[in-house]
Amino acid sequence: RMLYGFEVSVILIVLRQILEDFDSNPTESQASYKYVTATEIKEEAELFLPTTFNRAKFEKDLDRYIDSIVSFGFLVEAKHAEGEKRYKIHRIIKEKVTLDDLLEFKNKLNDYDAADESL
């Protein structure tokens, strides 16, 4: 069992949620693969990752985390779309990040929000 860092784990959860939304959307069910751009991944991941004062470093770190996920086989680089990297979310991510993992992550976020509001 491979251990991932916090940031990579968060991005894996985000990708799994994107794939779950794709699979449960009847209008997109004719497509068999979900493609995302690097920008889409970053925008979703930023909601859960602490940003630093150095925006350029944060962007570079996100690129590095995405590259790691590609090397693990959860993302497959596809053709570039309008000069931007595009990735296919590999369905093996469903085996690594289960629906239970998604639920646990959401519950932890809710607990964190509740604790934050009580301060």
Walk through the language-model features, giving the residues of each.
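Residues in the recognition helix of alpha-helical DNA-binding motifs
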Residues: Y65, I89-I92
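Short basic alpha-helical hairpin corresponding to helix-turn-helix/winged-helix-like nucleic-acid-binding
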Residues: R1-K34
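Short, amphipathic alpha-helical interaction segments positioned at domain boundaries
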Residues: M2, R91-L119
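A short, conserved structural fragment
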Residues: I66, V70-A81
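DNA-recognition alpha helix
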Residues: Y35-P50
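Short acidic, glycine/proline-enriched loop segments that cap or flank alpha-helices
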Residues: N25-Y33, T52-K57, E77-A78
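Short, hydrophobic-biased segments on the C-terminal half of alpha helices
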Residues: E59-D67
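Minor-groove-contacting beta-hairpin "wing" of winged helix-turn-helix DNA-binding domains
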Residues: E82-H90
